[in-house]
Regions:
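Helix-biased detector of long, well-ordered alpha-helical tracts
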Residues: 1-2, 6-183
Length: 183
């Protein structure tokens, strides 16, 4: 979700809050998404929501539903990605929760940020005459996903198949390790 809400006002800042829920088999496929990349991406999509409101992400909480097939090393790899994202974007991981899951991995991340009063941008403030600008490129992440899905379907039919992504690294990176646009 790209939904952000405004919490309460204080001083010259507004508190911004956003939450995303990512479910295995719906939002990601662990057959081709490394856990470190998943941790990174899970955090960055939340940071992006705050940046989209002209805010700055400050803190996150991470809550996980974990099935029995995951070991401690898997979780360490996932949190390496979270930590990398937090370090790059100067965001603090301040808490979270864990629970057992019968159906795979569930990830819920809440990001708290702040924006200057009067400069926070809301979706409902858009008007017909507004200019919409895009930073980055459109469709590269989707093309990366299509490549991964194509190679997965071939692999499922031929177990000795080795995917070849040469020349497609940029598309894969847009899918597996996207960056929040803060410019």
């Amino acid at each position: 979700s790209e939904m952000c809400i405004r919490d309460r006002d204080y001083t010259d800042k507004q508190v911004l809050v956003t939450t995303d829920l990512l479910l295995e088999g719906i939002h990601f496929d662990l057959m081709y998404v490394p856990l470190k990349h998943l941790g990174y991406k899970s955090a960055v999509v939340n940071f992006s929501d705050i940046y989209a409101m002209n805010g700055r992400p400050k803190q996150i909480t991470v809550s996980l539903g974990i099935s029995k097939r995951f070991c401690v090393e898997d979780l360490e790899e996932f949190y390496e990605g979270i930590k990398l994202a937090c370090d790059i974007y100067d965001v603090d991981l301040v808490g979270g929760d864990t629970s057992a899951s019968r159906t795979g991995l569930a990830i819920s991340i809440t990001c708290l940020g702040e924006g200057e009063k009067g400069k926070v941008v809301y979706r409902n403030g858009a008007k017909e005459t507004d200019l919409i600008c895009v930073s980055g490129d459109l469709g590269a992440a989707y093309m990366g996903l299509q490549l991964l899905e194509r190679e997965k379907s071939i692999f499922n039919g031929e177990k000795d198949f080795t995917p070849d992504f040469s020349g497609k690294e940029y598309l894969l990176e847009r899918q597996l390790k996207p960056e929040a646009r803060k410019d």
